[in-house]
Amino acid sequence: MATLVDPPNGIRNEGKHYFSMWQTLFEIDTKYMPIKPIGRGAYGVVCSSVNSDTNEKVAIKKIHNVYENRIDALRTLRELKLLRHLRHENVIALKDVMMPIHKMSFKDVYLVYELMDTDLHQIIKSSQVLSNDHCQYFLFQLLRGLKYIHSANILHRDLKPGNLLVNANCDLKICDFGLARASNTKGQFMTEYVVTRWYRAPELLLCCDNYGTSIDVWSVGCIFAELLGRKPIFQGTECLNQLKLIVNILGSQREEDLEFIDNPKAKRYIRSLPYSPGMSLSRLYPGAHVLAIDLLQKMLVFDPSKRISVSEALQHPYMAPLYDPNANPPAQVPIDLDVDEDLREEMIREMMWNEMLHYHPQASTLNTEL
């Protein structure tokens, strides 16, 4: 539970109060009353809370010492920029970003999201029975949210069950946009250690420079398979092993299906793998609906140019009971998400402060040089 504590050094900043949760100090706006910690990651701690002004339950994510690691600072800045613009019922809403007291010295960032009950990873791990209707509804919402994100010219690039938040009535929302990029960005290959390998498309594993929205479709296919089988379909131990597992299940690829590989060494590796006839997905998932298997086969295609698109997936017969072509408006404007990878800390700090001001316009009149 949350414990009210004295401020560090006994100095209380105006408009803030202080709580300890899981040995972590939260310095938060007084309108938020924390309930309990609900999650922890490399970034810090998340707690549930009530906004006493609106009586709404929210999740507060504390990102500790955000400038200690420049990559993490850039991830946070991207998330702020993106979620300020995205408005869709299958994308998590960022409600507030708390304003620090001092612009030039703040280290921690507090993000306030709508509160969800759990995530798809926890549901898949649980003993909760997942019917065909469950799988269909989760997949439909994931595709709807992704179609909207792609319409804003954005690749998510880190879709996995843990980044899909779910509430008690099975509403699903995509979260964690720290790795998202504009889909026309070139030459920004993904940093190995931050990308989740099991959901990574072949073209990323093969270090192809020219990738697009189909990388997210591959991840959706992996998530769909995990919903059907209650375990990840490709549990590789490292990059080459991941490729080997993919070929084992999909089967050895024809020469024309390797044309997209622009890295000669990577192409040689794929050709060197022992022949595999592949495995039948209907045998892997004997309880799955025949149309579910058909859609999964169209998502888990090695060659990205032959993989089904999000729009096509929504129009697949498996989605027919849920899909309404008139209920999927695109994002209003393509979002300029480009954040220079080489920004110095002072510039990241300045841009982050400006993002915070969108939620607290009155703060722009205050002295920010401290």
From Swiss-Prot:
Instruction: Name a GO molecular-function annotation.
Output: kinase activity
GO biological process terms, semicolon-separated: auxin-activated signaling pathway
EC class, as a word, reads: transferase
Q: Reproduce the UniProt comment on modification after translation.
A: Dually phosphorylated on Thr-191 and Tyr-193, which activates the enzyme. Autophosphorylated on threonine and tyrosine residues. Phosphorylated on Ser residue.
User: Which residues does UniProt mark as catalytic?
Assistant: D158 (proton acceptor)
Which residues are listed for ATP binding in this entry? I38, G39, R40, G41, A42, Y43, G44, V45, V46, K61
Q: Which residues carry this modification: Phosphothreonine?
A: T191, T196
Q: Which residues carry this modification: Phosphotyrosine?
A: Y193
Q: Give start-end ranges for the coiled-coil region(s).
A: none
Q: Which reaction does it catalyse?
A: L-seryl-[protein] + ATP = O-phospho-L-seryl-[protein] + ADP + H(+); L-threonyl-[protein] + ATP = O-phospho-L-threonyl-[protein] + ADP + H(+)
Q: Which keywords does this chain's UniProt record carry?
A: ATP-binding, Kinase, Nucleotide-binding, Phosphoprotein, Serine/threonine-protein kinase, Transferase
UniProt EC number: 2.7.11.24
Fetch the InterPro entries from UniProt: Kinase-like_dom_sf (IPR011009), MAP_kinase (IPR050117), Prot_kinase_dom (IPR000719), Protein_kinase_ATP_BS (IPR017441), Ser/Thr_kinase_AS (IPR008271)
Activity modulation: Activated by threonine and tyrosine phosphorylation.
Q: In which tissues is it expressed?
A: Highest levels in the stem. Present in the leaf, root and flower, but not in seeds.
What's this protein's family per the entry?
Answer: Belongs to the protein kinase superfamily. CMGC Ser/Thr protein kinase family. MAP kinase subfamily.
By its UniProt entry, which PANTHER family does this protein fall under?
Answer: MITOGEN-ACTIVATED PROTEIN KINASE (PTHR24055)
> Domain description from the entry?
The TXY motif contains the threonine and tyrosine residues whose phosphorylation activates the MAP kinases.
Quaternary structure note: Interacts with MKK3.
Write the protein's name. Answer: Mitogen-activated protein kinase 1
Species of provenance: Arabidopsis thaliana (Mouse-ear cress)
